[in-house]
Amino acid sequence: MLNIIYVVSLILIKFIFYKECNNNNNYYLSNIELYNYKLRKRNRILNNNINDRKSFLSDLEQNYKPLFDIYELSANFEKRRKELEKKTKGEENEIEKKKENDLEKKKENEIEKKKENDLEKEYNDVINLLELSLSSEYKELNADVSNNDNSGHEENNKHKLNKKNSSNYKNDKSLDELIKGAILKLKQNPNIKNKNMLDYDKIFKIIKEKLINKNLASNKIKGGDNEKLKEEKKQSDISTNVEVKKDIINDQLNKGIPTKKENKDDMINKESNKEDITNEGKSNSLNNLNTLNNDGNIITKVYDHYTIVTNSNDILNDISIDASDISKNSIGGINIPFNENDNSSFTHQRYIVLSNNGEKKYKIVLMTKNPKFMDMDGIYDEEEKKESLIELNQKVNKEENTNLYDGTGTLYYGKKSKKEKENTQQKGGNNPNVDINILNNNNNNNNNNNSNNNSNSMNDEEINYNNNNNNKESPSMFRRFINFLSFSGNENETEDTLIYHNKNDNSYKNKKEGTGKNNDNNDPNNNNNKKILLNVDKLVDQYLLNLKNNHTSKQELILVLKGELDLHSKNMKNVINNAKKNLEKYFKEHFKEFDKISYDISTPINFLCIFIPTLFDMNNMDLLKQALLILHNDLHEYVENWSFSSTYHTYEADYIKEQDSVYDRSPKKKYIKASKKLYNNKYSFLNKFLNIEPLILFAKKLNSKRSNIEKEILNFLPKELRDYSTWNLSIIRVFNAWFLAGYGNKNVKVCVVDSGADINHVDLNGNLYIPEYNEKYEMTQDFYNFMVKNPTDASGHGTHVTGIIGGVANDLGVVGVAPNITLISLRFIDGKKYGGSFHAIKALNVCILNKAPIINASWGSSHFDVNLHLAVERLKYTLNGKGSVLIAASGNKSNDNDISPLYPATFTFPHVYSVASISRNFEISPFSNYGHKSVHILAPGHHIYSTIPNNSYKIFTGTSMAAPHVCGVSALVYSVCYNQGFIPQAEEVLDILTRTSIKIISTKKRTINDSLVNAEGAVLTTLLGGLWMQMDCYFVKFNLEKGKKKHIPVVFSAYKKGVYETDIVIAIIPIDGKSKIYGEIHIPIKIVTDVNIPNFQESPRRGKNYTIDSNEAQHDEVLSYICENALYNLYEYDSHYLLASVILFFLALLSIFVGMIYMKSRKHSDKKCSKNLIKSNYIPEMDDGMEETQQLQQERRQYFRELFGENLEKNYDQHFVQDFGQDFRQDFKLGSTPDLKQYSDIDLQNKIQQPERKTVKIIINNFEDRKKETKRRLLKGLNYDGENAKKHDFTNESISNSRKNFKFSNNTEMKKNTIKSEDVKIASDDNVNKAMNQLDDMFMK
């Protein structure tokens, strides 16, 4: 009842306050349906009915649609298109098959006929050859018979007849023997290829019949001289013909008669040539004309620069596109500058103009699909550099990412660069194309010839363990004891390596190689990263240390075999079995209780583990040395390294400090939010709006609708996700990431190598995947049950980690970072906390076989294990060379990993990512390890609520909880890439996480980036094309109304040299929800970014300069809001710094205020002084020290009051200053010497009115008693020199020498002391008036 009242009240409130209710009739029904769904969902939560969970999840999926659900729609459309294409192709294939069958039958008939003809020809040739070869012999036989007949002329006829009959019988008998002997020789003739197909009985009969007939014909010919001559001539011709015929037949036999296969191939080649010619003509016609294929309901129209695929002609008629322009120019206010000077940076821009010419309104979404990158290393040689760019592009093989994560994974070494291949050859790596038997034969030959050739290679040497003859002294017992006690598995091993002995020379060498810090250089191609075999003493130390710590019956000796070898080949099986037998033989000689040795193989990672029984101790370690040397003699040609297994433990905080309590009430630090640039300003998609007007308009829109957008994003997610999730998901902005791209993709697998997991947990069962038993795992059924099938979690650590990564989004428990991915939990911990490197490597091999792109490792050790190092290194060859990401926890000892490294977190491979823990106060957790050179990123690891066995939940703390957060974000990035149709490079995914992370400036413990992982920024960057291609965020999604257009800039910013390919897909959907119309525009892009290639033009041609006007379509408001707030950094509010800033701010304001007052007063005083100066020039009111009496001043003031009135100052300014000085201002310039002659008396009198003349007379009269002072003050006004502010000296001495020197007297008479040509004579009152008028004008100016 309460629920009904609650829902009804909400509907009424919505009805009252919603303005557009009257215009929308369907609004009420839609709101009732929405609240009904919420009510049903709430009832399920209250009832907690587990049986109803499946229907709840189905409702959840139907109502949950991410912002970029277009990928799902596009995938379904592509699936439909392929089905129709397959159907139409099937019909076409049936017709083609019929044609092919008819053609094949015709070919077979022709071949059979040709075979019969050839066989018949061969019969004729053989018969002729036999006939010719037997004719002479048979003739001699008949001659003998005829001679015997002619000797008895005298006998009667009867006697002759009997004798003739007997001779004929003998003749037939000898003829048969003659023919059989010739046929026997024919069978032994190697020149006859098809002799087994001949019927020799048939040949015998034919030859015998021909010879007899020929003999009878010759007997009928009677003698005579002419006839005999003819016969001899004939026989001679036959003999010559026989010789010629024999040569011809032998030549034919040597060349060989064409076989059936050859004839068939010739026929097929002829037919294929015909088909190629016809197809070539078809392809040329297709290139010249646009094609239009209608596969049922799917229409495909091909243009020069793009292809349209749709199920409706409306899109073809309404939408027009221009995708041909490639330019570096900017579009109006969207400025993307191009750096002409820096050739190392590359930008490519394509401007797409989309227009709607129809009557419908469409929703437009941009996507990228099938991106590919091909490294240029090894594609072309020096000779190929002469070729053009187009020819080089054609040589680049397109890699089809089929099946993606399906099937069985392998290690692909084909993409090794030239430097890597050279390094593997230096290490003794085998060419995968070379047969191992050939390699062994070469090794044997080298060993046999070793007496004459001293070789340093591994194949020519073998170990000789002999303490008496060893050149290098064995370490002392004390030194060995110290080494044993201070054993540490630092990767910087000693340079002591195994000592090799040349067998025949009996000379000894120390095989020394540069150690190289394997984790001090990210470049795997560095020649310093050479692997060396641990010497036997180190192996013995490892064995004794493991014996001390672990009481087991067997120890695991792991041998890392070369990656290119096939361990399942017969040769490698024989090599391993022989090594095993030799080792067993040695053990049986020294230990009677010993039975046999077992071993384990892991492929494709190529690790061999031999289980050594614990029969050795400190007393018989020499026997262990000898056993290891025997093993090395058998396998050193195939081994890269070897060592005994190490022990690893999980990272879970052992304790929680008081200040780390859950109920900590200490004040939290505050931070300010500042937007960050993902790329350089010239490439950033956040720095496109440079004009002020678009910025102001856009800000107004955002400010007016910001609150509504925030509510829309918040209400987008189901209530359960917000209720059951904790602070850790909100701090890394997972909600907005789900809003953009969804919960993930089931095809993406995350491999959790830990203590196992509860496979029956309600929050894990839906996402956990248990791989079926396969022989490729190469493990026993018991070991398979232990690691894969039933990974029982005794500690709960693995279950907790698994729940953080991918807890199912249901109505119970918690939600993981990526709730819709596939989880593979593998147990390598054999107890509650510890596990060996053999189990860890075996688990990594299972991850490789299952094509898992992400591996979580919330465990580690301070001992460097070379086996694990090599196993992690080989992860970069998974997924067809793309590589797998290894996310590792940094550790919980609050140590600096730069000084005290933990492994595998500090393996410096580009696909390994180390994670530290951060608290909810945006500080590195007190327990977390850090490292300015070894720890990459921060993630929540403080008080994380997640799953534990038996359907329970618990709070754990540690960096083990931080690493799975980064795994989950990586899974979201891989999910977006899967939707786009490709597998990204492992380094590129980690680079995206780094560049989009939130900078935490206030951290005291430093890391490489000092930043927090940002799920929203990483997903958004991947959706916009990744690192090298950036579609502007504001142009990715918008509505295209009738008559509108849109300019879409796409910027490519290549950060690696190579070949980039992708397809920009523009999805077109009508706004009408009932419409099933859908279309896509595919724009292929291919860029070569190696400036060293000839004919490479880094700067594309100049294109059109577009201008954005009012006809431009509007951006999507929600997406634009996300784009503005997706990438930012946090800066801490420092209270002391803030207080100091406030004080300085107010001091600045105060100083500005005081300065303004001072300037105002200064300006007022200057104005007053200028007026007083004018007055003082005509009214001699001087300062203190004037000789004028107070009574004289009062008289003068009284006179001016009578003259100008009471308002003396105002009238004086108006009547005297303006009228008197304005006329002369035009003719008199400041700083110049006045010309007293240029004005006449009349002019001066006209310009000087009566009041001014009176004033001048008063001034002259009053100057009588102080002429010296007055003269100086009157002439002081001439000391200003215009704009140049140049001062002139107008004292008495200078004036008398250069210009004028006036002398005033009581009679108002001016006399000149020195007479010059240019001086003025003053002799009367008129002259005085004239001179004083000129002086007045000068002073006024």
UniProtKB/Swiss-Prot annotation:
Residues 502-515 have a biased composition (Basic and acidic residues). Residues 430-474, 517-530 have a biased composition (Low complexity). Residues 1-18 form the signal peptide. Activation may be calcium-dependent. Inhibited by the non-covalent interaction with the cleaved propeptide. Glycans are attached at residues 165, 343, 449, 453, 492, 550, 641, 728, 820, 856, 892, 950, 1009, 1105. GO terms for cellular component: membrane; merozoite dense granule; microneme; microneme membrane; plasma membrane. Pfam families: Peptidase_S8 (PF00082), Pro_sub2 (PF18513). GO terms for molecular function: serine-type endopeptidase activity; serine-type peptidase activity. The keyword ATP-binding does not apply. Residues 1158-1341 are cytoplasmic. This is Subtilisin-like protease 2. It comes from Plasmodium falciparum (isolate 3D7). The lineage of its organism: Eukaryota, Sar, Alveolata, Apicomplexa, Aconoidasida. The gene is SUB2.
